[in-house]
Amino acid sequence: MFTGGGTIALIERLATSWLTAIRLILSWHPIHAPNRNQEPLDSLCREGREYIVMISGTVHPRHATWPFWQVMRKCLDWCCAFHPPDDHSCEFGAPRIGIRLEGENHFFAPILGLYSVVMTWSPISCYREFPIRQNSKEPDPQPSTSSEPEPQPSTSSHRNIPVARVRPLVAQQKVPKTRPLDTEIHRPGPIAIQNPTDTDEPELRLNPRPRPGPSGQNTRPRTPTLDLDTVVVRDHPVTHRRPRSPSPPEEDYTNQDENLSYTPQLIHSSPDSEVAEEIYAQPDPWGTQELLLANRERTPDDQTDITDDSADWSEGETRRPSHSEVGERRLSRENNSEDPNRSRSRSRSRERRRRRPRVRPGRRSTATTIRDLVVLGMSSSDDE
């Protein structure tokens, strides 16, 4: 069909076999049972969809459409489905399941849309309707705008019964089809491409910039015809995502001192993560990204929360709070819960006591332990 080699008979058989296969699937489903008419429509549609999936996908994942093609082959072998409307020579009667008799059935309207799609890609000629003037036999491409009253239809006597003779108002004209529907209209293009018709430059309006073709070269998109090689194929997949913004430049923020190192956390930390890129591409009306970039430019000397303890623990270990931090948390918690009616001197003395690092009985600090070991070692060496 794409190359124009399909005949009219083959295309009609293909479209009719599809319609017949769908009718068989719908007739097998118990949705048409008389005792199921009172069930809600959403449950029936859900069961019908599951039933069709079960029919079309129970053989093998690579041959999921095998049952459909088997049904289509049976339909192609069934001659009664492809008889013309005025043919009565079939010995099986005249079931007339062909596509030509299904136009008045609104239940199969979505299925009949496939027939229109098949005919669109076929080289079969189309028929366009033109209005006909009452005083002329030739078709008029434009509708008549004259204000003259339409003539009354003439009457004649047939078996003593007056019969009105009315000329047809519409005539059909056969139009050869040179190419299918324009794929540029139905297929959305890449994002962030300016429309040449919206620009103010007359050169771009008359000669728009060439867009990349199927081979990736800067060639103009060719007009799609019945040849498969001339169908325009987009290099970029259709997506609803916003265009990705470039990642910020990577710089080394490690200080010369080995004990102090500052590695800021960025939103765009992993360039391979599409989620991070999507967040980074969002608009920033509150200036959050500028604040993050400003924090990156700060020197480690400006960081007041970096201590020697934070440089000692490695990346894989979890940091344990120091005794001073625990004491400050307890102090702030107790200060908030204190009664304001107490004397200020008593609260100040308690604050001074709480600020001192508390040493539990039986547990000594690391510095004291090392100093004692040094003293004990020196005393033991003197004794020897």
From Swiss-Prot:
Ranges where the record places region Disordered: 133-257, 297-368
Biased composition, class Basic and acidic residues, residue ranges: 316-342
Biased composition (Basic residues): 343-363
Compositionally biased tracts (Acidic residues): 302-315
InterPro entries associated with the record: Marek_disease_virus_LORF3
Biased composition (Low complexity): 143-157
Protein name (Swiss-Prot/TrEMBL): Uncharacterized gene 12 protein
Species annotation: Gallid herpesvirus 2 (strain Chicken/Md5/ATCC VR-987) (GaHV-2)
